[in-house]
């Protein structure tokens, strides 16, 4: 890193800044949801669409981001991503209704979807390949700090200012980032093949309509027959994409990916697994504030052990997988995450609050080992010619499954909490207890898929740093 020219180091700082903005916004909102609900006159049990709208938009837009960067230029697209993200933040802060806030989050999601993948592409173009890993480690470090800082910062802003400030703080930072991008970042472009617009539209419509059908009756009052029609339309769009991909050589995602058994199994397991684990970052701060009466700041602080556990486990997960194998690790962590979720609910409802940080630390560790194992299992056997496409599809599936998970969590809360419930009341405790029990079952189910993972054929390489001799 020290051998790089000054202008290249500045460009890496810009990319790192984008990673930080996107990762911070992913976690800072969850802590503020109950306060948003009170301000907007909504039930806190129906605020999940604020999260779903952002994550689903990221999932829909991810496949287009890389092509746009190659065609229009990394500087232009990264600049546009920061501008859209900043404008979305402004509109979020100005929102007076839940529907306005959801639409503003969609605009934010368009910017967020382009920021991270285009940032990775930028690093690949501006640094020598030998220094790529060191550069990516540098730019992704702020992205790891964002989830650690987000919940606590969100709690402070909500408790001592208002929820609007979790979006307003993005505006001056976004303006500086956009100006730096425009002035310092080169606009690399390359020849691109024709974009698969029909395939993109089919996937986008299928994902959006199926998610809407899953939650439409609770959040929008859509009739059952209309929901059935939406579900059928979404499924038809996905099936039409499969037919299109089979016939087209330039499809967005080639069906040749699924000839690799571990990719097919890993992708299915990742989709099912992240539906369950995607509920936890949304449900935990809502449960702490609405179910137990914690302040926003206290609830935000309680999320920090979970992030610390996740970051700490990443250092040893490769050794664990090499020792026990993918199948055992994935089955054990999947069932373990379900049990830890039940333990968290039990400890909280029993009033043993001093144990909550320890339980959340354990939850973060188990979840991190599971995530890392799912990701590497999915991609490890793909040929080089399909690795980029497979990684893009996995990224899209990760975001889609998280949005479905939050949608299901909101649906469960709405189903068990039909009438208005008070903070830290007996009725509220029952609503969250039934919801967490259902979540534990959903989290545990992917163990059936992971039990079919074949035996490992080779071990993963452990990257270690040699100590310099004195």
UniProtKB/Swiss-Prot annotation:
Residues in compartment: Periplasmic: 1-11, 70-76, 125-137, 186-196, 246-262, 307-341, 417-430
Spans traversing the lipid bilayer: 12-32, 49-69, 77-97, 102-124, 138-158, 165-185, 197-217, 225-245, 263-283, 286-306, 342-362, 396-416, 431-451
Keywords: Cell inner membrane, Cell membrane, Membrane, Transmembrane, Transmembrane helix, Transport
Compartments in which it is found: Cell inner membrane
UniProt-listed SUPFAM superfamilies: MFS general substrate transporter
Pfam families in alphabetical order: MFS_1
One cellular component (GO) term of this entry: plasma membrane
Source superkingdom: Bacteria
Topology in the lipid bilayer: Multi-pass membrane protein
UniProt keyword Transcription, yes or no: no
GO molecular function: transmembrane transporter activity
Major localization listed first in the record, in broad terms: membrane
Cited Gene3D superfamilies: MFS general substrate transporter like domains, Multidrug resistance protein D
Membrane-side (Cytoplasmic) residue stretches: 33-48, 98-101, 159-164, 218-224, 284-285, 363-395, 452-470
Family: Belongs to the major facilitator superfamily. TCR/Tet family.
Protein name: Putative multidrug resistance protein MdtD
């Amino acid at each position: 890193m020290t051998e790089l020219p000054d202008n290249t180091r500045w460009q890496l700082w810009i990319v790192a800044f984008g990673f930080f903005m996107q990762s911070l916004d992913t976690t800072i909102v969850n802590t503020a949801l109950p306060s948003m609900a009170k301000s907007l006159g909504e039930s806190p049990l129906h605020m999940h669409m604020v999260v779903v709208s952002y994550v689903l938009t990221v999932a829909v837009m991810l496949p287009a981001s890389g092509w746009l960067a190659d065609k229009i230029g990394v500087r232009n697209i990264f600049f546009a991503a920061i501008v859209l993200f900043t404008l979305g933040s402004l509109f979020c802060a100005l929102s007076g209704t839940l529907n306005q806030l959801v639409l503003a989050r969609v605009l934010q999601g368009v910017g967020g979807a382009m920021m991270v993948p285009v940032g990775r592409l930028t690093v690949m173009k501006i640094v020598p390949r030998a220094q790529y890993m060191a550069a990516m480690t540098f730019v992704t470090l702020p992205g790891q700090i964002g989830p650690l800082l987000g919940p606590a910062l969100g709690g402070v802003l909500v408790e001592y200012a208002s929820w609007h400030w979790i979006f307003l703080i993005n505006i001056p930072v976004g303006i500086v980032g956009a100006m730096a991008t425009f002035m310092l970042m080169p606009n690399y472009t390359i020849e691109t093949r024709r974009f698969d617009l029909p395939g993109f539209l089919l996937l986008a419509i299928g994902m959006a309509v199926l998610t809407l059908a899953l939650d439409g009756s609770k959040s929008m009052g859509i009739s059952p027959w209309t929901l059935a029609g939406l579900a059928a339309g979404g499924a038809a769009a996905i099936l039409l994409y499969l037919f299109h991909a089979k016939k087209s050589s330039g499809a967005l995602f080639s069906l040749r990916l699924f000839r690799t058994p571990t990719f097919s199994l890993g992708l299915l397991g990742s989709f099912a697994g992240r539906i369950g684990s995607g509920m936890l970052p949304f449900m935990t701060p809502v449960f702490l504030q609405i179910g137990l009466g914690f302040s926003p700041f206290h609830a935000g602080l309680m999320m920090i052990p979970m992030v610390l556990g996740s970051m700490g486990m990443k250092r040893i997960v490769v050794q664990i997988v090499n020792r026990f194998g993918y199948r055992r690790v994935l089955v054990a962590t999947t069932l373990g995450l379900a049990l830890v979720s039940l333990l968290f609910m039990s400890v909280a409802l029993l009033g043993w609050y001093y144990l909550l940080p320890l339980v959340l630390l354990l939850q973060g560790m188990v979840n991190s080992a599971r995530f890392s194992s799912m990701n590497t299992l999915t991609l490890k056997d793909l040929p080089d010619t399909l690795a980029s496409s497979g990684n893009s599809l996995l990224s899209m599936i990760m975001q889609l499954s998280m949005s479905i998970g939050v949608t299901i969590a909101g649906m469960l809360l709405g189903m068990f909490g039909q009438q208005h419930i008070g903070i830290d009341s007996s009725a509220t405790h029952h609503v969250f207890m039934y919801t967490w029990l259902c979540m534990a079952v959903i989290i545990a189910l992917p163990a059936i898929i992971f039990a079919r993972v074949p035996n490992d054929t080779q071990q993963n390489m452990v990257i270690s740093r040699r100590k310099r001799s004195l």
